[in-house]
Structures are given as C-alpha cells and as structure tokens.
C-alpha cells in the first residue's frame, strides 16, 4: 500500500494499492492491483446465511474486488461485485460511454462502476 488511504474494516489480501482511497469494509483479493482509484466500500459484510444464498444467486461473486483484477483510474461505488481477472483500465481511452445495463459508465475518461453492480470474471473495460 503506497500513497493511499484505507478505511476501517477492510479485508486486504496480498495485493497492490497505489494512490487510491479504499472505503469502509472493502474486500480486495489476492493479486489485485488498484491504482488511482476510489473504492466506496460496502454497506455490510456478506456473512449471514441469507447473504450466502444471495451470493450463490449472483454467480458466486462476493462484494469486493476479485483475484488478479487490475483497476486503474476508476470509481467503484458501494457493494460492487467484481469477479476474478477483471481489467478496468480504459486502455482505448474512451471518454464517454453509457453502459449502465452492464454495470458501469464512462465520463471524462473515468470508469465508474455503479452501486450493487456485478462485473463477471474476465470482464475487460
């Protein structure tokens, strides 16, 4: 973790975080790289039986950032579920895109993942 602010209650596992703000109860899995990003965090931990059932219905992706995902210059709203090996890099430098049905939009070149969004494993933005 370098040049970053980490909120209370975060679960951070062997990942790299640089020049970012990580909000309350954020979960970041192994191998993830977070750069120049604002993670809003989560409203709750998914630990109850009801939460586990909901998790199974959502494709098994927990709230937070999945393994080996790479996120750069993005805003991740609360309770977002980002799968393993997701790349949010905006490599094509798209300035504007309305993809709310896919769980995100781009304004001014900044990718914003909307609240409660689900980005399946392997997604590339």
From Swiss-Prot:
Transmembrane segments: none
Recorded family membership: Belongs to the bacterial/plant glucose-1-phosphate adenylyltransferase family.
Modes of activity regulation: Activated by 3'phosphoglycerate, inhibited by orthophosphate. Allosteric regulation.
Tissue-by-tissue expression: Leaves.
Function: This protein plays a role in synthesis of starch. It catalyzes the synthesis of the activated glycosyl donor, ADP-glucose from Glc-1-P and ATP.
Pfam family, one: LbH_GLGC
Family annotation (InterPro entries): ADP-Glc_PPase (IPR011831), Trimer_LpxA-like_sf (IPR011004)
A GO molecular-function annotation: ATP binding
EC numbers on record: 2.7.7.27
GO cellular component: amyloplast; chloroplast
The protein, known as: Glucose-1-phosphate adenylyltransferase small subunit
Subunit details: Heterotetramer.
One BP annotation, GO: starch biosynthetic process
CDD domains: LbH_G1P_AT_C (cd04651)
């Amino acid at each position: 973790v370098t040049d970053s602010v980490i909120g209370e209650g975060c679960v951070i596992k062997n990942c790299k975080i640089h020049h970012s703000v990580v909000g309350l109860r954020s979960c970041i899995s192994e191998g993830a790289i977070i750069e120049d990003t604002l993670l809003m965090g989560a409203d709750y931990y998914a630990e109850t039986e009801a939460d586990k059932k909901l998790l199974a219905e959502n494709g098994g992706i927990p709230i937070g950032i999945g393994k080996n995902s790479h996120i750069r210059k993005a805003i991740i709203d609360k309770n977002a579920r980002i799968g393993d090996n997701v790349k949010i890099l905006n490599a094509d430098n798209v300035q504007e895109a309305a993809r709310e049905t896919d769980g995100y939009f781009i304004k001014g070149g900044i990718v914003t993942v909307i609240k409660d969004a689900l980005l399946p494993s392997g997604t590339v933005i």
